[in-house]
Structure formats: structure tokens, C-alpha cells
Amino acid sequence: QMCIRDRSILYIYYGIKDGSIKDFTPTTFIFGAKSAPGYRRAKAIIKLIGEISKLVNADPDTKDLIKVVFVQNYNVSYAEKLVTAADVSEQISTAGTEASGTGNMKLMLNGAVTLGTYDGANVEIVQEAGEENNYIFGARVEELAEIMPKYDPREILFSNDKIKRVLDKLIDGSLSDGGVPSNEEGSFKELYKALTDGASWHVPDHYYVLGDLESYVQAKLKVNADYKDKLAFAKKCWLNIANAGKFSSDRTIKDYAENIWKIEPVKL
């Protein structure tokens, strides 16, 4: 779901530019990822993040408000620094597509609030630390089951001018892919068409990017506004740390031993 994140940054960038987003707290957006050599779409998304970085980091109107950083070859050594420093943990898989993960738990334990969908271990995080101490957005699994069979992303594209502006930047020459195969004429056309027309292996906007985008941006802006009250935000962080005990490996092993393996502890 990196593609919804890069589009949200463009949405905010152009909102700052046109004055519709005001009093924005300076924010650094950090991406860390890898792609298999032949995974063209992933390569194109990484290239797009680089182009967005060049755009917003150099613009005198936004360079003191937004920074975009892509960490190449993200690994444990980088994670040791970033996880401990992060204020916000973005866990933004489309609801129902993430089995679970541990990255969000590590960030929670280090005091980051979660900005994410109601998916994977995010569900347990908000159950433990409280939804009021985190930021949940987007359609839930049961809602998507009703939405997706009749979902037409073009309806959103042509009814929301701000989302259309963001998507148009992929094909109007504002951002160039620099020659990534299948994107045609130096644009990010394949990324655009994946959302509007689909591809050989999926329907249009298979991951409900456009459907969740407005909700995601509004959640992001709420985090941004809440961060101004440092004491209240710190309280959210501390409550996340204090309620991270469920994710202890000791608790997990004890539960497995009692409920799955049916074994008793042995004193050594």
C-alpha cells in the first residue's frame, strides 16, 4: 500500500500549495522498502517516491514543511534507528489483506502511535491501547465485502477534484518514470491505469486505494494537528507503550503452550 501513501503526500503537497491545507506541522515522511528485480510495478512505485521527494523537498513553498526520504535497502540496521525515533507508525494495508506483522508492535513498544487501517495486528493494538490513542481510517473488511463487487474507482476520480489532481500528475508529465518498462512515454501510466482500468491479474483499484484515500488524508491531517499539543500526544505514546504487554513473546509462547501444543512448563 505504498502507493496510497505516496498519493497522500501529493494530496497534502498540493493542498499546502493552494492554501486549502493550513497550519501544517513540519513532517518527514520516511519510506523503506525493497523490490524484486523483475517486479515492475514495485520498481515504478519506488521511482515515483523518488520523484515526489525531488518535487516537495526542493519547492520553496513546502521544503520547510514536508520532507520525503526513501531509505534504500531497508534492513534491521536501519530499523534499529528508525523504529526508536518514529512518532507515527503507518500500517496501511487494505483491510483483510494483511495476516499480521510485528513491525507495528515494535513501533508501538517504542512509543509510536499507529495510523492505519483496521487490519492485521492493528486490530489488537487498538484493542489494547485504545482507538482514541491511535488513528484508524478506511473501510473495514465487512464493508469492503459489500463495496468491491460494484465498486467503480472512476466515480471517485471524477467526483473528487483533489484526488483527480493527484492522479493526473502521474500522466500529465509533472512526474517522470525515467524509463521504467510498461509506463509509456516517461509517465507513470501503468500505475494510473491499475487504478482506473485494472490489469491482467486484477480489477480496477483492487486494493481500494482511491476509496480509502480521502479518509487516509483526513486521518493524517488529524495526527498532524494533534502533534501540536506535545503533552497530549506524549500521553498517547505512553499509553501505547504501557499497553504493549500482550505482544510479549513470553505471553505468546505461554498461550501456544496452553491452547495449541497442550504442554506443561518444565522447571529446570
What are these language model-derived features?
Residues 20-25, 61-65:
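Short helix-terminating capping/connector loops at secondary-structure junctions
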Residues 2-4:
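Short, small-residue-biased leader/transition segments that mark boundaries at the very start
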Residues 8-21:
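Histidine-anchored nucleotide/phosphate-binding helix
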Residues 8-11, 32, 40-47, 71, ...:
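A terminal-accessory region detector
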Residues 84-85, 92-237, 241-246, 251, ...:
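Catalytic binding pocket for nucleotide-activated donors in carbohydrate/polymer assembly enzymes
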Residues 64-65, 87-91:
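Short, basic, glycine/proline-bearing loop/turn elements
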Residues 25-33, 85-88:
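Glycine-rich, often proline-containing surface loops adjacent to acidic residues and nearby aromatics
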